[in-house]
């Protein structure tokens, strides 16, 4: 790849209305879409072929610009049902998006709005018409990039000022974003998973009570819990262990979320440590997995480029099976730092990084990937049943089959 620290990159379009300025001075020009403005963020790439709306509304992408490696994004439009952030009015999720091709008119029976208008309404700045393969290769070689994405229909940009902003931004390390995306107060979640015939349902006869600590939770996680018979009480990220226990839960869920897990060390990690000391079943996903590892005495580290996509192979040591899963994280647990009473349960077959753990002798476990998918494969849905079975075991009930039986 040609070095382009002082001039416009070679994969750009002639008439620019948006630009991406990397911290090293590289400038990528294209067509602007979505919101007008400029913002600093980390540039990553996602390899999923579908589910762009779920990806862009995943709160785990707060502080990031998503480069879609699949060239055609926006074909099926958008709708209110596929939004993943818990409070859409707050527009938590990715702040920028990068596409290979221009957005076309949507064609789908569920579409209510085209992607460009939807991006505008959510305040997401987008750039189209660039060589996303070249940008993805750059990220793979140099790592996730700090950058500024800017959109102005006039095409007029102060490049030197934008370069200075990109170079000055400190990035996601030591940045606590969980407090920014969490709910403001507790709420009860009843919505169950979507079906083609009925859409979303509602859980009116719950058998269990799960408290979910919201560090940036996705809706589909909560739906899968309610779909298995749970009443879910969602608490803010800053809730204490005493706050959680006051709800008398049967189990505790630690959600996904954005930012550096170590930056939550002043509030979330101590809370999780106290919860682990109880006999309550605890299940964590993504950021929740990382914070659980910290609470157990482990360490986390910033990854070179992170894992973002719906086609990642993971091995489950507890079953010996390989699953294809969805991932979205830029930090990872250092498996060598885990204490002796913590067992590694899952590992990435791409790079060998830790993807799961459990505490020996306690009903506590977590995974780095996203078993709820949305978007992605459903290979790991069984983990929600594994969590519910820990609750059922404490109640003296017969466990559910971890995998649904064929009809």
UniProtKB/Swiss-Prot annotation:
Instruction: Answer yes or no on keyword ATP-binding.
Output: yes
Please provide an example of a Pfam family that matches this protein in its UniProt record: CPSase_sm_chain
Region spans: CPSase: 1-205
Q: List the disulfide bonds.
A: none
Keywords for this protein: Amino-acid biosynthesis, Arginine biosynthesis, ATP-binding, Glutamine amidotransferase, Ligase, Nucleotide-binding, Pyrimidine biosynthesis
Q: Per its record, what are the GO molecular function terms?
A: ATP binding; carbamoyl-phosphate synthase (glutamine-hydrolyzing) activity; glutaminase activity
Residue ranges of every copy of the Glutamine amidotransferase type-1 domain listed in the record: 209-397
SUPFAM superfamilies (UniProt xref): Carbamoyl phosphate synthetase, small subunit N-terminal domain, Class I glutamine amidotransferase-like
Function summary: Small subunit of the glutamine-dependent carbamoyl phosphate synthetase (CPSase). CPSase catalyzes the formation of carbamoyl phosphate from the ammonia moiety of glutamine, carbonate, and phosphate donated by ATP, constituting the first step of 2 biosynthetic pathways, one leading to arginine and/or urea and the other to pyrimidine nucleotides. The small subunit (glutamine amidotransferase) binds and cleaves glutamine to supply the large subunit with the substrate ammonia.
Kindly provide the name given to this protein in its UniProt entry.
Carbamoyl phosphate synthase small chain
- The source organism is Brucella anthropi (strain ATCC 49188 / DSM 6882 / CCUG 24695 / JCM 21032 / LMG 3331 / NBRC 15819 / NCTC 12168 / Alc 37)
Name of the encoding gene: carA
